[in-house]
Amino acid sequence: MHRFDFLNRANAEYVDHLYELYLRDPRSLDETWQAYFAGFEDAGTREAGSGLSTTAPMTIGVQNLIHSYRELGHFVASLDPLGHDRPSHPLLDLRQFGMSEAELDLNVGKADFYGPTDGTLRDLLAKLQATYCRTIGVEYMTIADKAQREWLAQRMEPILNKPAFSTEESRALLFQLIAAEEFEHFLIRVWGGSSKKTFSLEGAESIIPLLNSVVDDGAGMGIEEICMGMAHRGRLSVLAHVLNKPYEVIFSEFEESILPDPSTGGGDGDVKYHLGYANDRPAKKRSIHISLSPNPSHLELVNPVVEGIVRAKQNYRNDKEQNRIVPLLVHGDAAFTGQGIVFETLNLSELRGWRTGGTIHLIINNQIGFTTPPEQGRFTPYPTDVAKMIQAPIFHVNGDDPEACVHAARLATAFREQFKCDVMLDVWCYRRRGHNEQDIAPFTQPVMYAQIEKHPTTTDIYARKLVAEGKITQAGVDEMRKVARERMAKARELAREKRPRQRTAALNPLWKDFLVTPAEWNPKTAVSRNVLNEVAEGATRVPPDFTPHPKLAKILTERQAAVKTGRGIDWGNGEMLALGSLLLEGTPVRLVGQDVQRGTFSHRHAVLNDFNTGRQYVPLANLKKDQPPIAILNSMLSEEAVLGFEYGFSSADPRNLVMWEAQFGDFVNGAQAIIDQFIAAAESKWRLMNGLVMLLPHGYEGQGPEHSYAYLDRFLALCAADNMQVCQPSTPAQYFHLLRRQIRRTFRKPLILMMPKYLLRLSDSFSRIEDFTDNSLSLVLDDPTIPDRDSVKRVLFCSGKVYYTLAAKREKENVKGVAIVRVEQLYPFPKKEIQGILARYRQAREIAWVQDEPRNRGAWHFMEDHLRGLLPDPAVLTYFGRDAAASPATGLNNTHKNEEELLVGHALELPHKETREAIDAQSKIVMEKSAPEKIAEKNGQEIKLAPKEVKEPAEKAGAVAVQGQNRAKD
């Protein structure tokens, strides 16, 4: 027989392991387990002697009984408002602890139970069930920190998890429920027939007093600001009853009569249940600021954004203890389980560069996801099980017990403030209506909704309870309802008479000077040579007791020498000068991404590691005393949550330069939802600017389809209304000016940078000191090698690495009459600059766009639309690049080289080695293959040139497309 068979079988092996540790060294265990095993051994000694004692085994059984109820009591708690009883748990049977019902009246004491008992097993069992098996079930015994476990037990067990509520508190709680219920009824009554969705909170009204408890009790604990994120379910009620958004403003949004904020201009706007809001509201005799971030319908996507906002605010408000600004996230049960970004965001919670001191999570567990029941959406008992990975305490609460919800909220808030850890509130409730007000839920859940239809509302249940307790009369309840209805009716009249105005600026006062976009996009960004020397000296200096890697020491020396001589300033050096100069000017810097401290391509080396000890040193953080902070952080291996966090960080404080770098640009599509919903569209939807910089390594070098391409075409397709900038710098100095421009302007736009890989070590791309001190950003770089512009017959526009490939080939082949122009900023499209370039080449009859990417990718379609209208007569527009392809790039290096040779050969040689008649002949041969192309030729719309003969199979030759296009007539 196993020596611990009288324990829970599930725990026997674990206890056996602890016992082995006890035998080696009793002090290695905490006091509870020491006493446990001491009693066990004492019992064994007496059993071997003259008499048998039942006291020691009983004591051990009692201790394990208490432990098991703490660990497993939630499994039999009454959590479901719809009354689906949970069966008794076999591991809580008395026989598991070596006891029986015949011993219920024995005096067993209470071991380490903190609650009051009369000493009998019966009373202890009743108190354990009252604490852990009523309408609150708690999961906290998996927490490794003993202090956290004891703190929770000491606050739950003495009051049996059921604090007393005064008459005043109970009435206030009831009125919150009534206001929430009547609000939903009012919206349905007035607008329910107009197909306007509200995503009602009905069935989960208890979250209103729960959230207000977090706010009020948090204020009493010293919390100054709560930053919230939540989806659509119940959002309007939370705005009205937690953030105190005026009813008349919400009603005006239903009527679509609300006036826009004049400080933010136009925009497309968004549906009312996506909009954000911020307000200062009274709480515990003081004011607390609450903000609710705007969010899309993409569930849980706002989570890392809110965390980034909180971290930025904690930084600039010097909340080092992270106890004054708190994140609060409201989730749905199905989404919390189903969306991977939840896991990613939880993983960020304890990482040094991203932790916010703990998030209060509230799950509106209405036991359904649109039409999907829990058993089809997860395999775990609870939606919160994913949170066990961060050892967060989890409070499961019955939503029909609003007092239990408030009590759990108080515990959760206090725990977060005490231990700076995440905490979970899982409110079991139901959804009285369908997914939206037009949805017919009984189509898919007929049994559930038959039960819901008969079930009284939470408000009615609680009102009857208070009436029975004598805390209020039925007339008092009716009066509360009357007051709530009158307030809403009055607010609707006010909304009709006086159109309220949106308050976008209230979301963050730091943006008050950045809300209007000025006409000037390109301020001065040059820096004096003295400043550059100061940066170079400081950023290459290490302490006397620090030993860098020998090769790194050489790199640092070369960087400083390049700045001093003014020649050969490479990309890592140019970035260092940009960041250092901004730091000296007072701009905080944050650079985040996978492997950014060294750089994926070993080009940055911004964080140095001592060769002997591994100690880290950041030269840019030590340029001078009292400089602003710089954080250069290797992120976890995730794109979506990390990018969302950095977006949130940048949105909270426009004074920071915030940069996120992808390991390769190809992986950026792992964060596509953040890009689509926030980076590209937030200004238009919610009038929120953002200055985030995205660094996306991009370039075709034969490395295959996942290491070549940063989805340039997708970013350009998202561009409209000056919503962001898309650039591809071709020199370190251009990169330098782009970063500085991002901060020097008086407005903020996201900056998407296609960054080089091959060019990082290409000396032809390096910059001179004059490029930093005498110039600012050039949106377009003209060809510096053309002495006689009238001799140019063809102008090749391009962007990025392909410029250097073309230039090297042109020089090698001594090609004349071809100018190569770099477009550094693709969007906003530099129309004026390109018009100026075209005016210089008056004799050019062919204007071309050249790109590495396939025809259906890259910038071709974007540039085609913009260049066509700028062509002078009789010039034609031509495309040189790879043909359309399903995959971004070939995985075969030889194929890549052949494609590149063919592409460059066409772009540089065809106009000079073949006559126009020969070109036309080739185009006819191609077009003869399909009737539509012949028609296109007759209509003057499209001409395709066959590739030059190469030593490749026909299908290889076809991998490069050369297309001419006549200028469209106005």
What are these regions (language model features)?
Residues 40-206, 223:
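Extended, charge-enriched "interface" segments that sit outside catalytic cores
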Residues 162-180, 184-187, 256-307, 311-318, ...:
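Active-site cores of enzymes that catalyze phosphoryl transfer or operate on phosphate-rich substrates
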Residues 369-380, 388-424, 428-434:
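Conserved phosphate-handling catalytic cores of large alpha/beta enzymes
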Residues 187-248, 554-561, 569-583, 587-588:
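Active-site pocket-lining segments that scaffold enzyme catalytic pockets across diverse folds
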Residues 57-67, 74-106, 181, 246, ...:
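Flexible, glycine-rich loop/tail regions that form catalytic "lids" or insertion modules at the edges
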Residues 937-970:
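Long, low-complexity, intrinsically disordered segments
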Residues 224-391, 395, 601-653:
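Cofactor-binding active-site loop characterized by glycine-rich and histidine/acidic residues
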Residues 1-40:
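Subset of Sec-pathway N-terminal targeting signals
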